[in-house]
Amino acid sequence: MTTTAVPPTSTQLCGVFADIDAAVAAAHKAFLAFSDCSLAQRRIFINAVREVASQQERLEYMATAAVEETGMGNAHHKVLKNLYAATRTPGVEDLVMEARQGDDGLTTLEYSPYGVIGAITPTTNPTETIICNTVGMLAAGNTVVFSPHPRARHLSAWLVDVLNRAMVEAGAPDNLITVITEPTPDTTKALITHPDITMLVATGGPQIVNMVLSSGKKAIGAGSGNPPAVVDETADVAKAASDIVQGASFDNNLPCTAEKEVIVVAEVLPQLMTAMTANGAQVVSDPEELAKLRSLLLDTSGTRPNT
């Protein structure tokens, strides 16, 4: 796979700012203008995001650049992740009005935006998260300030610029999404506590998720996952083996939703092991090989990735 997409030649990237205050101020100004846009206009802007983010050359560039900058993942798999984020994230079609009729008349219930959302994105899914958040949050009428993982900051700034340009070309206000150029723990704290940030969304590890959930603001946190796959005597063992191997190997097992361990009843263990091996899994039981794998994959504490 080659990086065929060319980053913008302009020295001024759209929506990219040097500090949190400037990024929030721009997103807040954009929110005021965005509030005057109709649902039909929102759909147009979001369709522009979907289109520009799902072009093959950009999919390949984002996937390859993410692996290069973060040092993590499988570029071929990231192409699919970005494509699905662009094409399958729900948009304005999910904003369904409810109507209730009774003796006192008709009541309608409609969703309203929170305002400016502070969104913290991870190193494991840097572009996928920005695309997904942009579609979903803008569909609801919000604007977004992104705080990317430091090891994905260059690609994140590039993507925010690309998406903003596509939306502006479709008639959107400037800076519907913004990002800072040099994210740090201090800038993340400043984003969380900023008075003009009305909602927080964090995709990352337990520490950052706990920070937003204890911020006192409306917050959604998606932290690290450790999903088990349970296989018992009622399972379709061949299908279970195929699904587990495919899920656990997808994007080098970076997604928090991917299978991380298998719990299996003794009765079907031999059959499952054979089927998993047939699907490309490898059995490693030699202590020396296990030690080498641990040192390759984990840091000296044995509790964190060796990045």
Region annotations inferred by a language model:
Residues H28-F31, S35-S38, V49-E57, A66, ...:
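Structural signal for hydrophobic packing residues in well-ordered secondary-structure cores
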Residues A85-G91, D161, N175, L290-A291:
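N-proximal accessory regions
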Residues L13-V16, I20-A27, L39, I46, ...:
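Generic structural signal for well-ordered, non-membrane alpha-helical segments
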Residues R42, D174-T178, A258-K260:
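Residue-level recognition of the N-termini of beta-strands and the immediately preceding loop/turn
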Residues V6-P7, C14-F17, V209-T307:
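ALDH superfamily catalytic-core signature
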Residues A86-P90, T187-L191, S295-S301:
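Short, solvent-exposed polar/charged micro-motifs at secondary-structure junctions
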Residues M97-K239:
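Rossmann-like NAD(P) dinucleotide-binding subdomain of oxidoreductase/dehydrogenase enzymes
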Residues T2-T108, G136, A278:
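N-terminal Rossmann-like NAD(P)+-binding subdomain of aldehyde/semialdehyde dehydrogenases
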